[in-house]
Curated annotation (Swiss-Prot):
Belongs to the GTP-binding elongation factor family. EF-Tu/EF-1A subfamily. SUPFAM superfamilies: EF-Tu/eEF-1alpha/eIF2-gamma C-terminal domain, Translation proteins. Keywords: Cytoplasm, Elongation factor, GTP-binding, Nucleotide-binding, Protein biosynthesis. Pfam families: GTP_EFTU_D2, GTP_EFTU_D3. Induction: By elevated hydrostatic pressure. This is Elongation factor Tu.
Amino acid sequence: DLLSEYGYDLMDTVDEYIPTPERDERKPFMMPIEDVFTITGRGTVASGRIERGVIKLGDEVEIVGLVEDVLKTTVTGIEMFRKTLDEGQAGDNIGALLRGVNREQVVRGQVLAAPGSVQTHEKFSAEVYIMSKEEGGRHTPFFSNYR
């Protein structure tokens, strides 16, 4: 049908015009953890979008951040949109099944990373500008220990 023909032509033109983004695969693996859940009988899964690097089945990783201790584990499964994979690359949204990790040991905001590639920091210096109410910013003040 005519619509299908033009639709395919349009998408071919778009594919030619817009370059495919390059994936940052040469740097060490790192994935911010967006969600954590348990699969009964299998274990704990950390999900998120891989920021850089490649992760493969059997790779050792560290869970870093928000707690003092770094937790070491092994990736025993990788899934993307209910498809089992042998590896995940930068840009992929995956779930990584983690060996010997309890659900309570992993939280959103931590990072799954290649061993020794990420360090945590407890303090940093910053200069912050807070927009006024008139500028479209906050209407109420910040209080001590604001999170």
